[in-house]
Amino acid sequence: MNETPKPNSFRSGPDEDGRFGIYGGRFVAETLMPLILDLQDEWNKAKNDPAFQAELKHLGAHYIGRPSPLYFAERLTAELGGAKIYFKREELNHTGSHKINNCIGQILLAKRMGKTRIIAETGAGQHGVASATVAARFGLPCVVYMGATDVERQAPNVFRMKLLGAEVKPVTAGSGTLKDAMNEALRDWVTNVEDTYYLIGTAAGPHPYPEMVRDFQSVIGTEAKEQMLAAEGRLPDLVIAAVGGGSNAIGIFHPFLDDPTVKIVGVEAGGKGLQGDEHCASITAGSPGVLHGNRTYLLQDGDGQIKEGHSISAGLDYPGIGPEHSWLNDTGRVDYVPIMDHEALEAFQTLTRLEGIIPALEPSHAIAEVIKRAPKMGKDEIILMNLSGRGDKDIFTVGKILGMGL
């Protein structure tokens, strides 16, 4: 593909049609279009409303626990013998991941729009837990669609959602993972447009979702930039994050996009290897197409049918990626690379033993890339990585693979 021309700013998108270059847009059923336009209108008003922003900031500080710390991984840095490694500790947020940043923002929007029912999709269950959490906090009923495969491998999060009062609906269609859960949630939304708000968890879906989710998650990069300047007096040389749909990644990347000295890398799920279909590396091994209301890189066959991807990590097990990532790839601003299941598993164990932090399997993919790159960099160079979630939810998966009975 010809390289997309570089814009004056990498931070000015999307355009009024919700496009990032040829990606994004709004490909939705006619019934949903009025709702999408209404949502966009409300979002435009909310982001320019000081009262909305003040409430968001207040809940960020007192409910989520922001700002999350910037942590220097001293032992990992010493072990690898190269660049200084810093983690943005999003796993310390309320509910254990970055997902809550977006959920708080969207539930405030749902309340503003007068919606009385929340629906959400979830893969790893982290977004489901965060959605159920904010629904409980604001007294709204919540239905979470979750692939049957994920229900099985993320039992602790399913229990959490139920404890929080949400109804968890297992989806058996397809491979019973995130894509299928999103399909069901969209069907529900079409049927219940009047009272229902669809709280999308990733930076994908029809416009304005990719922009909205990015803006709510950009608090990660904005804080990290400030914290890095305070800690080191300069910006990092490299920013790394794991990418499934891509909300944690775009959240840390976006504030750095117009800083030319900062190299940015997104890490996709390479699964069992790119030669077969058992991976979720949409950019590395996919092609552009339309899924879930937007045009983006997808895993699809020659007839445009969506393939069933695979990843050890339920949160990266999605056959697409947010449209802004597709555009950032084509412009060359961000490099996207795959990490295999076994590499992520090894990184999971390395971080746990060296730093006393049990990471989720999603950011373990990013840790694996850090482990590859840090030794090749100078000791005066700095890596910033988004540690997007904690690994409590993954101990059963990891225990099973390592042959440790739980």
UniProtKB/Swiss-Prot annotation:
Keywords: Amino-acid biosynthesis, Aromatic amino acid biosynthesis, Lyase, Pyridoxal phosphate, Tryptophan biosynthesis. Pathway: Amino-acid biosynthesis; L-tryptophan biosynthesis; L-tryptophan from chorismate: step 5/5. The keyword Lyase applies. Its EC number is 4.2.1.20. The modification N6-(pyridoxal phosphate)lysine is found at K99. It catalyses: (1S,2R)-1-C-(indol-3-yl)glycerol 3-phosphate + L-serine = D-glyceraldehyde 3-phosphate + L-tryptophan + H2O. Pfam families: PALP. GO terms for cellular component: cytoplasm. Its cofactor is pyridoxal 5'-phosphate. PROSITE patterns: TRP_SYNTHASE_BETA. Transmembrane segments: none annotated. GO terms for molecular function: tryptophan synthase activity. InterPro entries: Trp_synth_b_CS (IPR006653), Trp_synth_beta (IPR006654), Trp_synth_beta/beta-like (IPR023026), TrpB-like_PALP (IPR001926), TrpB-like_PALP_sf (IPR036052). Belongs to the TrpB family. HAMAP family: Trp_synth_beta. The beta subunit is responsible for the synthesis of L-tryptophan from indole and L-serine. Tetramer of two alpha and two beta chains. PANTHER family: TRYPTOPHAN SYNTHASE, TRYPTOPHAN SYNTHASE-RELATED. This is Tryptophan synthase beta chain. It comes from Rhizobium leguminosarum bv. trifolii (strain WSM2304).
